[in-house]
Amino acid sequence: METKTVAITMGDPAGIGPEIIVKALSEDGLNGAPLVVIGCLATLKCLQAKGITPNVELRAIERVAEARFAPGIIHVIDEPLAQPEALEAGKVQAQAGDLAYRCVKRATELALRGDVQAIATAPLNKEALHLAGHNYPGHTELLATLTHSRDYAMVLYTDKLKVIHVSTHIALRKFLDTLSTTRVETVIGIADTFLKRVGYVKPRIAVAGVNPHAGENGLFGDEETRILTPAITDARAKGMDVYGPCPPDTVFLQAYEGQYDMVVAMYHDQGHIPLKLLGFYDGVNITAGLPFIRTSADHGTAFDIAWTGKAKSESMAVSIKLAMQLA
């Protein structure tokens, strides 16, 4: 059987990414698995020398084909920092943002070429990314640009709750101006395709409303009747099992209890808050709509505890395992 390899990007080297990657890859279930890290080898060795990460072999390779997977070995494709000695833990720095960008770019090239079958990303810092001249709101938009993907969406994934977002990194004031029937219908379709890919035969998809009580028949806003309902009607006409618009304050609990397989959230915090409350340590961020699987730990760079040894690797480990499963 063909070995499916996952590339793991370091994220911002001044954050917890390097630490949680090495910790995760030293665990049972990932130790010796077909995984290749793309990041700054000098940074990884520095953390190891400080006793922050386990004492495993960090083996440099230039190509994925060179890897010989075995317990106790982590294979690294080196993307060096311009000035590794100048890197400061927990600080926003242009060279760190540039490294995070280059790691994602290299991983994308490997995935599109077929050298790896999925990507798992450690968190990057958006301010550092912008400081380096890479003006993307986050991983999702960066990957969409690198792969020329037009229809994509952010999924937050746990065993008991799965959420897909119509919008993500946009100011709430601007969100309503960009909301459209076309976008909502597109995201419903992405959700249906994604769920079928991961094993759901007839996915049940709930669409959350925008307004309190899903508008209460227009009393608290007309977006539900004017924008969401036509999208739901069109999706049903295409054979999708779609429900809503559902009151946002109850639909996530209903999905968590098994009534729906995925919730379509309208904006970033509407979807992120319930999922992080119910699955902070085992939640995985997935970009649906790319030509390959991309997963990510569902948290940020945690600059406040970077390079202290305090970072927990559970979410990173879960995201890598899910990438291996879905690849």
From Swiss-Prot:
Pfam families reported for this sequence: PdxA (PF04166)
Keyword annotations: Carbohydrate metabolism, Metal-binding, NAD, Oxidoreductase
UniProt GO molecular function: metal ion binding; NAD binding; oxidoreductase activity
Enzyme Commission number(s): 1.1.1.408
UniProt: a divalent metal cation binding residues: 169, 213, 268
Domain of life: Bacteria
Chain positions recorded as substrate binding sites: 139-140, 276, 285, 294
Cofactors that this protein relies on: a divalent metal cation
SUPFAM superfamilies: Isocitrate/Isopropylmalate dehydrogenase-like (SSF53659)
Catalytic activity: 4-O-phospho-D-threonate + NAD(+) = dihydroxyacetone phosphate + CO2 + NADH
Top EC class of this enzyme: oxidoreductase
Comment on bound cofactor: Binds 1 divalent metal cation per subunit.
InterPro entries: PdxA_fam
Family stated for the protein in its record: Belongs to the PdxA family. PdxA2 subfamily.
Summary of subunit composition and partner proteins: Homodimer.
NCBIfam families: pdxA (TIGR00557), PRK03371.1 (NF002891)
Job description of the protein: Catalyzes the NAD-dependent oxidation and subsequent decarboxylation of D-threonate 4-phosphate to produce dihydroxyacetone phosphate (DHAP).
PANTHER family: 4-HYDROXYTHREONINE-4-PHOSPHATE DEHYDROGENASE, D-THREONATE 4-PHOSPHATE DEHYDROGENASE
UniProt protein name: Putative D-threonate 4-phosphate dehydrogenase
Organism: Salmonella typhi
